[in-house]
């Protein structure tokens, strides 16, 4: 099925699902400036969509550029070129993006697009580098890319690259989207950011522990996020995902989530999606492999 953005002649159409950071602890800062963290990722059955077709001339053409993002620095283009370099292929690609996820939202839009590009073109180009190598390429593009390449809910450590698969409940989430772009660099550079949270064991986390250490910083610096949290907390325990700006609450069923969504003002866009331990992208690739 194609969207208005992706033409019917695209050879391969794949989802690029959103993710939530159900918690995020900052343990410290490394000498290179990166932060040691612990976080829990789960995917959503909602996201962007990408279409791909093979080119014989080696060119990478993204036909749906994003306003304000130069072609050469777009993560989709960078992922495609990194895969070309790593595999030695002479093939290129036409790529179309149906952008549904907000930028600067903390739900992984750009990282997910990059991972879908790596996996999609690895399939179309028959480069077959394997998940480990693709995750390695992805890490050079961004700390969140490997979790999308792996496609499994995970407890992440290090800078986010050390992944332990976990089995979580798959509740329904209401994700609200405050209309502000949150700078990840600003949040992680904030003097007031907690950077000394003690490490937590994954079993303790799954028993209900954890918080988001970035949330107090974002609430202080971005009143749009603070006000959205105050509003959503009237209905459900709400939390920031990643560095935001998106916030979320969980529900046992879709009806309950939809009821709250209908009570939010039009100035606070939102969507309802179910948590997934296996990403939509991997479900689609598994289905293709069976054909």
UniProtKB/Swiss-Prot annotation:
GO biological process, one term: isopentenyl diphosphate biosynthetic process, methylerythritol 4-phosphate pathway
Highest taxon of source: Bacteria
Family listed: Belongs to the GHMP kinase family. IspE subfamily.
Biological role stated in the UniProt entry: Catalyzes the phosphorylation of the position 2 hydroxy group of 4-diphosphocytidyl-2C-methyl-D-erythritol.
Residues the record lists as binding ATP: 102-112
Pathway: Isoprenoid biosynthesis; isopentenyl diphosphate biosynthesis via DXP pathway; isopentenyl diphosphate from 1-deoxy-D-xylulose 5-phosphate: step 3/6
Gene3D superfamilies: 3.30.230.10, GHMP kinase, C-terminal domain
EC number of the protein: 2.7.1.148
One Pfam match: GHMP_kinases_C
Species name: Ectopseudomonas mendocina (strain ymp)
Enzyme active site: 19, 144
Nucleotide-binding keyword on record: yes
Family matches, as NCBIfam families: ispE (TIGR00154)
Keywords: ATP-binding, Isoprene biosynthesis, Kinase, Nucleotide-binding, Transferase
Name of the protein in its database record: 4-diphosphocytidyl-2-C-methyl-D-erythritol kinase
GO function terms (MF aspect): 4-(cytidine 5'-diphospho)-2-C-methyl-D-erythritol kinase activity; ATP binding
HAMAP family: IspE
């Amino acid at each position: 099925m194609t969207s208005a953005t992706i033409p019917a002649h695209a050879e391969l159409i794949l989802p690029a699902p959103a993710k939530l950071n159900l918690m995020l602890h900052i343990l410290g800062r490394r000498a290179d400036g990166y932060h040691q963290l612990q976080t829990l990722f789960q995917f959503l059955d909602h996201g962007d969509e990408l279409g791909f077709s093979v080119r014989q001339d080696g060119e990478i053409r993204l036909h749906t550029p994003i306003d304000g993002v130069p072609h050469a620095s777009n993560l989709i283009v960078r992922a495609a070129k990194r895969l070309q370099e790593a595999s030695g292929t002479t093939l290129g690609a036409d790529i179309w993006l149906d952008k549904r996820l907000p930028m600067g939202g903390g739900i992984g839009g750009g990282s997910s697009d990059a991972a879908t590009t790596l996996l999609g073109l690895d399939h179309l180009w028959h480069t077959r580098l394997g998940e480990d190598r693709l995750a390695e390429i992805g890490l050079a593009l961004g700390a969140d890319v490997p979790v999308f390449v792996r496609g499994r809910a995970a407890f992440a450590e290090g800078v986010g690259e050390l992944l332990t698969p976990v089995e979580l409940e798959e509740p329904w989430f209401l994700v609200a989207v405050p209309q502000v772009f949150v700078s990840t660099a600003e949040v992680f550079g904030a003097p007031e950011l907690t950077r000394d949270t003690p490490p937590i064991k994954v079993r303790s986390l799954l028993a209900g522990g954890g918080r988001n250490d970035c949330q107090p910083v974002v609430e202080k610096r971005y009143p749009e996020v603070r006000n959205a949290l105050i509003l959503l907390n009237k209905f459900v325990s709400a939390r920031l995902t990643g560095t935001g700006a998106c916030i979320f609450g969980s529900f046992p069923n879709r009806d309950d989530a939809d009821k709250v969504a209908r009570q939010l003002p039009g100035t606070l866009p939102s969507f309802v999606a179910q948590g997934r331990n296996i990403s939509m992208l991997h479900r689609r690739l598994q289905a293709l492999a069976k054909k």
